[in-house]
Regions:
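Conserved small/polar residues in nucleotide/adenosyl-binding loops
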Residues: 210-215, 227
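Short internal beta-strands
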Residues: 33-41, 119-121
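Glycine-rich phosphate/pyrophosphate-binding loop and the adjoining helix
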Residues: 152-189
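Short, acidic/small-residue loops that bind anionic groups at enzyme active sites
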Residues: 97-124
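Glycine-rich oxoanion-binding loops at beta->alpha junctions
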Residues: 52-86, 91-96
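Short, glycine-/small-residue-rich phosphate/pyrophosphate-handling segment
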Residues: 116-151, 163-170
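Short glycine-rich anion-binding loops that position phosphate/pyrophosphate groups of nucleotides
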Residues: 14-15, 65, 89-94, 123-125, ...
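Glycine/threonine-rich flexible loop motifs
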Residues: 91-102, 127-130, 200-207
Length: 227
C-alpha cells in the first residue's frame, strides 16, 4: 500500500531524531517516497545532509526561505502528501499542534493541511506524564491525530517509563493502517491457528501437530483490504 505514496516526514528536535534515519529506510523499503522537513532543533541531533542523502530528497527547514517557497510553497508541501508523519514528536511540537501555533515551517505545515497526520511522541517520562502534555494528547486525539506510542523503556536521561519513541517498524505499520482503504474496511476476520483434529470414526481422529505459517500469511494479506 506504500508504492507510489508520498510521506511528508517532520523530524522534531529530540534525541530520538536519530531514529528518523531508519524510519526513512523502512518507508523506502515499502516503496514510499519520503519528503523530509526538519525543525531547527532536529538539526542539532542529525544533520540535514544525512537526511537528504538517505531520503534522496531536499530537506525543507525554513518557513522564510525564498528558494524553498519558490520551488514548493508550504501550503502545497502540506497538501501534496498522502500522509504526514511527525517523528519524533516533541512535547513542544505537540503543544503547538494542539493550540494551532504556527511559529516555524513544521508547525505551519501541520496547521495548513487536511492530510492525515501520524505522530510518534518522544520525550522524558515526566514531560509525557505532565498534565499539560496529557491535555494536549486529548486535544490532538479529538482533532483526529493518529498516535504511534510512546513506548515504555529506558530513557536517554537515565530514567525509566513511557516516553520512548516507537521503533520505525511500528511507525510504518501504524502508517499502513491509516493509508489502506480496501473493500473490507471495518470488517473483522477471525484467524485461527494451531494443530488440527479430524475425526475418522466415533473413537479415532487424525491430528496434525505442525502449525504452518499460513495463518500469519493470511493476517498480513488482509491488510491491503483494510480488514
Amino acid at each position: 500500500m506504500f508504492h507510489g505514496r508520498r510521506i511528508l516526514l517532520i523530524i522534531g528536535g529530540g534525541i530520538a531524531a536519530y531514529k528518523s534515519l531508519q524510519l526513512i529506510r523502512e518507508f523506502q523499503k515499502k516503496g514510499a517516497t519520503v519528503v523530509p522537513v526538519m525543525t531547527r532543533g532536529a538539526a542539532e541531533f542529525v544533520t540535514p545532509l544525512s537526511v537528504a542523502a538517505l531520503s534522496k530528497n531536499k530537506v525543507f527547514k525554513d518557513l522564510f526561505d525564498l528558494n524553498d517557497e519558490s520551488e514548493m510553497g508550504h501550503i502545497e508541501l502540506s497538501r501534496s502528501s498522502d500522509l504526514i508523519v511527525v517523528a519524533p514528536a516533541t512535547a513542544n511540537l505537540m503543544a503547538k499542534m494542539a493550540f494551532g501555533v504556527a511559529s516555524d515551517l513544521a508547525s505551519t505545515l501541520l496547521l495548513a493541511t487536511d492530510t492525515p497526520v501520524l505522530i510518534a511522541p518522544a520525550m522524558n517520562v515526566r514531560m509525557w506524564e505532565h498534565p499539560a502534555t496529557q491535555n494536549n494528547v486529548k486535544i490532538l486525539m479529538k482533532n483526529g491525530i493518529h498516535f504511534s506510542g510512546p513506548e515504555e523503556g529506558d530513557m536517554a536521561c537515565g530514567e525509566f517509563g513511557f516516553g520512548r519513541m516507537s521503533e520505525p517498524e511500528a511507525i510504518v505499520k501504524a502508517a499502513s493502517e491509516i493509508l489502506i482503504n480496501g473493500p473490507l474496511r471495518n470488517k473483522h476476520i477471525l484467524i485461527t491457528s494451531g494443530p488440527t483434529h479430524e475425526p475418522i470414526d466415533p473413537v479415532r481422529y487424525i491430528c496434525l501437530l505442525y502449525t504452518s505459517p499460513s495463518p500469519r500469511d493470511v493476517e498480513e494479506s488482509r491488510m491491503p483490504s483494510s480488514a
